[in-house]
């Protein structure tokens, strides 16, 4: 048995996904000139076991769903350029085809947080005596 075991969950596809994420982030920051993707952040990349596809999840700082859909379209159209640029840095026989997905998780989280804050404020208005006595159930 080898003394140098790789940690669980860090197999070849994980390493390739990590490398793709880093390289795509660099490409978006320095190589893409389209302003619709300037604020895009690569959140996650998952690669198929045979390395034929990479699912790329991104967010846009301070943008809405409409801007996200537009950026997804731009990135999809630029996927050929991005894939060929990736091929130069990846140490694989083939370069995965890129599929871009706008990740709405941050917007959903902010919306849920806002709803919770509003509900708590409304609850405080309806039961102000709890705030005075410190009886928060």
Swiss-Prot record:
Q: Does the keyword Cell membrane apply?
A: no
The task this protein performs is described as: One of several proteins that assist in the late maturation steps of the functional core of the 30S ribosomal subunit. Associates with free 30S ribosomal subunits (but not with 30S subunits that are part of 70S ribosomes or polysomes). Required for efficient processing of 16S rRNA. May interact with the 5'-terminal helix region of 16S rRNA.
Do you know which Gene3D superfamilies this protein is assigned to? Answer: 3.30.300.20
Q: Which GO terms describe its molecular function?
A: ribosomal small subunit binding
> Biased-composition ranges for Basic and acidic residues?
117-127
Quote the cellular component terms of the Gene Ontology held in the record: cytosol
Q: Which Gene Ontology terms describe the biological processes this protein takes part in?
A: maturation of SSU-rRNA
Protein name, UniProt field: Ribosome-binding factor A
Assembly, in brief, is:
Monomer. Binds 30S ribosomal subunits, but not 50S ribosomal subunits or 70S ribosomes.
Fetch the HAMAP family from UniProt: RbfA (MF_00003)
Q: Where is this region: Disordered?
A: 114-137
NCBIfam families this protein is in? rbfA (TIGR00082)
Location comes to: Cytoplasm
- Is Cytoplasm set as a keyword in this record? yes
Q: Name one Pfam family in it.
A: RBFA
Give me the stretches of Acidic residues compositional bias: 128-137
Q: Can you tell me which family this protein belongs to? A: Belongs to the RbfA family.
Report keywords, A-Z: Cytoplasm, Ribosome biogenesis
Give the source species. Alcanivorax borkumensis (strain ATCC 700651 / DSM 11573 / NCIMB 13689 / SK2)
